[in-house]
Design a protein with these regions (language model features):
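Short coil/turn linking the two alpha-helices of tandem helical-hairpin repeats
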Residues: 159-166, 229-235
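Membrane-proximal, proline-rich intrinsically disordered regions
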Residues: 22-76
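Elongated scaffold/linker segments in the mid-to-C-terminal portions of large proteins
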Residues: 45, 49-59, 63, 73, ...
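Bacterial N-terminal signal peptides that target proteins for export
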Residues: 2-9
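Conserved, well-structured interaction surfaces
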Residues: 42, 46-50, 55-56, 90-162, ...
Length: 334
């Protein structure tokens, strides 16, 4: 949405307050008094992560946690991409969904449904994280640091897109925070939580208990990105700090995937459904988990792949140019 902000790293290797959850601020009191609901540390921990991957508690296009958009449209990656790419000359989409053409021609305003959905996705995720931190902060220091990192990312995305933002670290009503104040808080929060994160180490889907969990490299990556655009956010450049934290990631055990497999290049392997079990896994610093079975979305990497292909393109590629296929049977043709 802003052409004067540098793009540094993709937050997923495929490659997140006016609380707006559908039933309020994550009320733990059941709507039906005949039902009881138990909020557990592991359940809420997973929900905080899942806000970046799924629309709600269902799959694909099922009902979502925010109002105004269907499940397939409301996901984090889809609206992050739409708002940052369709508003530039890097991408164009001919779909008639309300909001797409306004993005493409930069005619959006405060009533734009997808911008409102993106805003709500971030603030809803922040409310989940606030509840975890305020309820279960003493349960496990590493888990709490991870959720603080997820919340910091969502505040970063909010600040990056909207400038001045609503801010709260509890479930109380938010106060207004300027972009400079948000920058300062995010920086301090990241530096404070980093020591409690696990050491930087690539993970594969053979270890599902730790796969896609954030570690110190993810924190360094977000710090580097924050510092990279510091001049835009605060008026003061921080190039040396941006380089310092980028180098921490580069010097860690995470590495670029340089080895292809069969007819697929090393780069193509990053976007495949098995990228957690091949050499592509070593590149995934901040993964957003989707297994295509129990954790699915029409707004994640499937959107990035399927929206760029139509049926004719897929048919042509499968014969003459097999390495150009999009790796999925979905062809949405945007």
């Amino acid at each position: 949405m802003k052409t004067n902000i540098c793009k540094f790293v993709i937050m997923a290797a495929v490659a997140c307050l006016g609380f707006t959850a559908c039933t309020g601020d994550l009320d733990v009191t059941p709507i039906d008094p005949n039902m009881t609901t138990e909020v557990t540390p592991s359940g809420l921990f997973n929900k905080c992560y899942a806000n970046l991957a799924m629309a709600g508690n269902g799959q694909g296009d099922d009902p979502c946690d925010i109002d105004g958009l269907d499940g397939g449209t409301s996901g984090f990656i889809r609206q992050y991409w739409n708002s940052n790419e369709l508003t530039t000359d890097e991408a164009l989409c001919h779909w008639s969904d309300d909001g797409i053409q306004q993005f493409c021609y930069n005619t959006y305003d405060s009533n734009h449904p997808m911008l409102n959905g993106y805003y709500s996705r971030l603030t809803t995720g922040i409310s989940y994280c606030n509840q975890y931190i305020n309820t279960f902060a003493d349960h496990d220091a590493t888990m709490t640091a991870e959720i603080r990192l997820v919340r910091a990312l969502e505040y970063y995305m909010l600040m990056d897109a909207f400038g001045n933002i609503p801010f709260s670290t509890t479930l109380a009503n938010p106060t207004r925070m300027t972009r400079k104040e948000a920058y300062d808080w995010i920086e301090k929060e990241l530096l404070d939580l980093e020591p409690n994160l696990s050491d930087a180490k690539p993970k594969t889907d053979a270890d599902l208990n730790n796969y896609c969990r954030l570690d110190k490299a993810a924190c360094w990556m977000l710090l580097s990105r924050l510092y990279l655009n510091a001049e835009v956010y605060t008026g003061t450049p921080q190039w040396a700090k941006a380089a310092e934290y980028a180098k921490k990631v580069m010097d860690s055990s995470y590495k670029l995937n340089t080895t292809g497999s069969g007819k697929w290049s090393a780069y193509q392997m990053l976007f495949m459904g098995d990228n957690g079990s091949t050499s592509a896994a070593q590149e995934g610093v901040w993964r957003i988990y989707q297994d295509g079975k129990t954790t699915t979305s029409w707004a994640g990497s499937l959107f990035l792949m399927a929206s760029t292909f139509d049926g004719n393109m897929h048919a042509d590629c499968s014969g003459t140019y097999p390495t150009a296929t999009n790796g999925t049977g979905q062809t949405w043709g945007g």
